[in-house]
Amino acid sequence: MPKIEVLYCVLDGDIRHIAAHLPQPRPDVAYLVAWQQRGGEEQNAPGELLQRDDVKILVHKSIGLSKNRNFALANATGDLLILADADNIYIYEYFDRLLAAAAAHPEAGILLFQAAASEGSLMKNYPAAPCTYAERPRGSYFSSWDIVLRRSAALPRFDERFGLGAEHLGCGEEEIFLEQASRGGCRIVYTPQVIVTTRAATTGDRFWSDPKVRRAKGAVLCYMHGPLGATLRCLKFAAVQGKASVGQRIRALYDMIWGIFYLKFSR
């Protein structure tokens, strides 16, 4: 039977949230905690995690969520890898759904699912029917907690210019990762079933307050559609934001265009 490995990527004190949510041990599930520590005094892991034989904790000093995910993937040993945040909650039923989908799609290198908020509502407007990533409805996108990776597949690394903790682009790493994988020939299949509950907010909620999120939107559009296509989409996006002030829209457009140029000329 395939082994599931939940890859928790956490920073400093966020590790404390994991212990409260772990289900009882299960022979086909293991947990890898990639724990970034930013320096200063040495931090101790919660005793509840240290007592679990199914939990491995690896400490490193890098900065940035994408770097942490790459670190976790490089050290993973399971067959099916779940990308997890500290606030994610898993139950046996979710693992069973994942295993069933993986068995139904042995050709898929990446499996996509749904996430639910703690009160039961879906975290976003997901496609209603199963589909491949290439055939997904327009406007559909997926977050890290929706993604399960087959370790044996040819997978890209996360682009470390994107994501929380990155210098300029504060999100978008999942969209770039999935697009790179798809272009590289990896088959990606979506199953409309919930496999995780979370209390976390999406980075899209910070669009108007965080310039790094706005820059990332421009950069992601540039990767997907090229500089010209991205610029036209940014102009349209800024024009239709009727609830935002003129100043907010100008600032958003500036940051998105900045992101386009950054992606085009950086590496």
What does each model-identified segment do?
Residues E119, C131-R150, F162, H168-L169:
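A recurrent flexible, glycine/aromatic-enriched loop bordering the glycosyltransferase active site
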Residues L164-E179:
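Acidic donor-binding loop at a coil-to-helix junction in glycosyltransferase catalytic cores
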Residues G185-T197, D210:
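Catalytic beta-strand/loop signature of glycosyltransferases that borders the donor
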Residues L81:
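Short aromatic/hydrophobic "clamp" motif used to bind/position activated sugar donors
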Residues E93-Y126:
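Conserved donor NDP-sugar-binding/catalytic core segment of glycosyltransferases
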Residues W208-R267:
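Non-catalytic, C-terminal membrane-associated alpha-helical segments of glycosyltransferases
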Residues I18-V59:
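Acidic donor-binding segment of Leloir-type glycosyltransferases
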